[in-house]
Amino acid sequence: MRENIVFDYLLTNAWGLPLCRVSVSEDGFVQCQENRENTQGLQLEKAEVDKIKSIVSEHTHILDCDSKELESPDVFDGVMNFFDFEASDGRKVNLMAFNIGEVKTHGMSFSKGLLEEGELDEIVVPVKAMEVVKTFEEIAATLVANGVDAKYLRLTYA
């Protein structure tokens, strides 16, 4: 995670090509990109940066999570989601998931994380993935309320 970044989100296609990105620095500068172009920049108040850190602090489970533990949906193709989160106490986590937005799709099947014990085809409830999405959505709501276009904060192609 870059030194002065408190939140960073990158959505790529299955081949790793960037679709959108939002990055929030410690000083409150927000940079938004779509398809590798800088398309929006704005400034947050310190209170909003602190709010983002506070949101992460409220979801402490994600700070102890590893990308290999995140449950994956049974989707052949799709997207990759990259998250950097920083809590109020300075703890940081960097996570990568495949198609994590599918936690919102009713009836979608999920398998255990890549290195979790158990059968590879064992269907599970995506508890860790849901916690990451919930944290992300709370931060996204704060950013949208402060002028960031929601198109930079999508979890899937759509």
Where are these regions (language model features)?
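Short, low-complexity, polar/charged sequence segments that are solvent-exposed and flexible
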Residues: 25-30, 43, 102-105
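Charged, amphipathic alpha-helical segments
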Residues: 47-73
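Short, flexible N-terminal segments of the mature chain
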Residues: 18-37
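A short, structured loop/turn motif at beta-sheet edges
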Residues: 26, 44-51, 85-93
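Short, well-ordered, aromatic-rich surface patches in folded extracellular/luminal domains
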Residues: 1-14, 66-158
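Short beta-strand segments
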Residues: 20-22, 40-42, 91-96
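Generic secondary-structure microfeatures
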Residues: 34, 56, 87-89
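Short N-terminal edge-element motif at the start of the domain
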Residues: 1-7, 11, 32-33, 38-50
